[in-house]
Amino acid sequence: MASICTSNFHFLCRKNNSSPISHHLLLSPSSLSFSRCGGLRLCRCAAVKTGSEGGGIRSDNAELLRKPVISTELETTSESEELVKEESDDEVGKKSGDGEGWVDWEDQILEDTVPLVGFVRMILHSGKYAIGDRLSPDHQRTILQRLLPYHPECDKKIGPGVDYITVGYHPDFENSRCLFIVRKDGETVDFSYWKCIKGLIRKNYPLYADSFILRHFRKRRRND
């Protein structure tokens, strides 16, 4: 392989340029070529990159000397995807239990609660039940199994046990209908189905309950 004589190299550079050679001259192997002329070996310099005088080599120039690290980028992408997956599983999961797709938890909560709200409103406001009427066995069973257990004071409301559930006027708000528990000791106790709905959300969706309730539940003036 041809070599460059240091003294000849400096001579050629001084002949072509009176200014001293920058200390930050960067040469790549491909930038040097040789030709023979009359038995003399001459050096031709091309594609020479220099740094600024009095400064170090810029990082972007240093990057030109490096090969693209494709494998590292792929590993980084893989790690990022794994991190996203772990965060999703920890917080909000955003994934269903079987991992087969993303779950919109807000829609899921609405699917679980909107039918119950509609069910109670039908009982209270459709005219199916007059004041003092007992709920049908099916309707009472739905209230006792799917709604009342989520009331924050469920045990206190039930007391010695439920005799039946009826519709009545709220004791504090005129003409406002609500549900009442007639207990086995003969006492009648009202309860808020809205508190039951909120309790259901907090029980089944603890990570999303507060934000969902703030977004979808306005402050109510009636304990209906």
UniProtKB/Swiss-Prot annotation:
Compartments reported by the entry: Plastid, Chloroplast
Transit peptide location on this chain: 1-50
A GO cellular component entry from the record: chloroplast
Gene name linked to the record: DCL
Compositional bias (Basic and acidic residues): 82-98
Knockout-associated phenotype: Embryonic lethality due to embryo development arrest at globular stage.
InterPro entries registered for this protein in UniProt: DCL-like
Name of the protein: Protein DCL, chloroplastic
Major location category of this protein: plastid
Start and end residues of each stretch annotated as Disordered: 76-98
Keywords: Chloroplast, Plastid, Transit peptide
GO BP terms: chloroplast organization; chloroplast rRNA processing
Protein origin, superkingdom: Eukaryota
Purpose: Has a function in the early stage of chloroplast development and palisade cell morphogenesis. Required for correct plastid ribosome assembly. Required for processing and maturation of 4.5S rRNA.
Record-annotated membrane-spanning stretches: none
